A protein has these predicted regions:
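C-terminal motif of bacterial Sec signal peptides marking the signal peptidase cleavage site
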Residues: 2-4
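Flexible loop/turn segments at secondary-structure boundaries
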Residues: 60-61, 182-184, 210-216, 266-272, ...
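Contiguous, structured surface segment used for ligand recognition
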Residues: 7-10, 14-169, 461, 473-513
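Feature activates predominantly on carbohydrate-active enzymes
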Residues: 102-297, 305-307, 313-325, 347, ...
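Generic beta-strand/beta-sheet core signal
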Residues: 55, 177, 205-208, 260-268, ...
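Flexible, acidic glycine-rich loops studded with aromatic residues
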Residues: 369-372, 380-517
Length: 517
């Protein structure tokens, strides 16, 4: 891939069932839908005379410009010549930071495509990056292939339009479970690339669970030398060294994706308990487990060594992640009393804050005394909404809408269905603002699609359950509620098929969608 997206798989032939009516081909293939869009007559044609003007030496802006130039080269065979900053000559594509665009927020942008020129402005490098992703979706899908597919330059057109765009929510996230099954650095980088394409900006990594511990902790090396060696089913696991994890954090940051590390505490900890028996109340290491049962494990909350362990783990991971968050889990703890659980979470909250991070936890932590900076991630459809509504900050991941490891239907080979069957329409048609009655409007930070990996052995499995539902969640998180429409989304997501195919994405061809060739 280009500068904003690392690698492009080899081209794949379109699925033989992929068809599209002419109405689907006429839509603008933009997902998520921009906040404001006006179509105009005409189009801008990219030719060998087209130039690229970049009015900033900011490193992130330059990366976005290189990505755009590479996408143009792949889709047309044309190498854009550089033009002086601010050049307004016919045939110019210009990228410019503009303080007057601050009204669009930290991630907004304005894009004007006219027959004579293309202008992209934003107040921040992030805004320009997201504007480039919009242009990317308007370019031919051949821009996603790693090699130019033709010998002679082939002009391409961009439809004339005017877009002013900004996200509805600041938190537009995805969670990837690398604990039940391990995914390599390259796999996770690919997922980052796909998130960035769809303007998502958080990747929550579930780094430890009963079946495996996936990040090196130098003060507790047995966590990975023993606890990181397997996964669900007993197949070989793996882990990230601290250098690898730091590299992943940097890779994501270049694409305006913040990595949110999670170490689930005090439950979901059998991999840690089997590595260090002193973390158990009886001092005996349990056998490693590779099944998918939950709720049976817990750190010994009455031992001082437990909190030394947590402080060391949080400290080492916090040093690797410049983002402000640390996810401490807190879910499905069935072996503690409510009072034990409450005291534990509040003590962990203090540790996390001491390392300069905001604590995030699954919605069970709403029953404890939380600091105003702490964040509750709502996931249980049957959770007490009155309790959740009092949370100082909320991330919404309702399992019956946003758990994209659920099956699409009863025939889906992968995934689970304990929360619900989630066809694409169900992932799309919900309003975060009304999900938790009584929650303050400013308490809802945004939305996160969770992908647990009990049934997923490789990235093709991940992509099959993620797409197209991840695109639906991206639009729920970005686009204004009043602009969203299922039938309109059906046409636009169907138009993504050539791009996803070029990227090698193993997406589910939902039967309710007319997939473009």
């Amino acid at each position: 891939m280009a500068a904003g997206c690392a690698r492009t798989p080899k081209p794949q032939a379109p699925h033989p069932a992929a068809t599209a009516k002419s109405s689907a081909l006429r839509v603008l293939p933009l997902v998520p839908l921009p906040a404001s869009l006006e179509r105009h007559d005409g189009a801008f044609t990219i030719t060998p005379k087209t130039t690229l003007s970049v009015a900033s030496q900011d490193a992130a802006v330059q990366r976005s410009a290189r990505q755009l130039a590479e996408l143009v080269r792949r889709s047309t065979g044309i190498t854009l010549a550089s033009a002086p900053p601010g050049a307004a000559a016919d045939g110019a594509i210009s990228l410019r930071l503009d303080d007057q665009q601050k009204s669009l927020g930290a991630e907004g942008y304005e894009l004007t495509i006219a027959p004579q020129s293309v202008s992209l402005t934003a107040a921040t490098p992030a805004g320009l990056f997201y504007g480039v992703q919009t242009i990317r979706q308007l370019l031919p899908a051949s821009s996603e292939y790693e090699a130019v597919l033709f010998q002679e330059p082939r002009p391409a057109t961009l439809p004339a339009l005017h877009i002013r765009d900004w996200p509805r929510f600041a938190w537009r996230g995805a969670m990837l479970d690398v604990a039940r099954h391990f995914f390599s650095v390259e796999d996770v980088e690919r997922y980052v690339d796909l998130l960035a394409l769809h303007k998502m900006n958080r990747l929550h990594l579930h780094l430890a669970d009963d079946q495996g511990w996936r990040i090196e902790i130098k003060k507790w090396p047995g966590l990975t030398t023993k606890g990181g060696q397997s996964e669900v089913g007993g197949t070989p696991g793996g882990f990230y060294t601290q250098a690898q994890f730091a590299g992943l954090v940097s890779y994501a940051a270049d694409r305006f994706v913040t990595i949110v590390p999670e170490i689930d505490l005090p439950g979901h900890t059998n991999a840690a308990l089997s590595s260090y028996p002193e973390l158990n109340c009886n001092g005996v290491a349990p056998s490693p487990r590779f099944d998918t049962e939950v709720g049976y494990s817990s750190l010994c909350v009455d031992k001082d060594v437990t909190y030394t362990f947590i402080d060391d783990v949080v400290g080492e991971i916090a040093a690797l992640t410049p983002g402000p968050y640390f996810h401490a889990g807190g879910d499905e703890v069935k072996t503690l009393t409510p009072e034990q659980y409450k005291k534990f979470i509040e003590r962990v909250q203090t540790i996390v804050q001491a390392h300069g991070k905001q604590m995030i936890g699954w919605d069970e932590i709403a029953a404890t005394s939380l600091h105003l900076s702490s964040i509750v991630q709502h996931w249980r459809p049957d959770a007490a909404k009155s309790e959740i509504s009092r949370a100082p900050k909320l991330i919404l991941s309702p399992a019956d809408r946003a758990y994209i490891d659920m099956k699409y239907d009863d025939e889906t080979a992968l995934g689970l269905k304990w929360a619900a069957l989630i066809p694409l329409k169900n992932a799309y048609e919900w309003n975060p603002a009304t999900l938790v009655p009584g929650a303050a409007a400013d308490a809802v930070l945004g939305v996160e699609a969770a992908l647990w990996s009990e049934t997923l052995a490789n990235m093709r499995d991940v992509e099959f359950l993620a797409f197209p539902r991840l695109a639906a969640i991206a639009e729920v998180a970005w686009s204004p509620q009043e602009r969203r429409d299922w039938d309109d989304f059906r046409a636009r997501v169907g138009a993504q098929a050539p791009r996803w195919t070029a990227l090698g994405v193993n997406f589910f061809r939902a039967p309710e969608i007319e997939w473009a060739r």
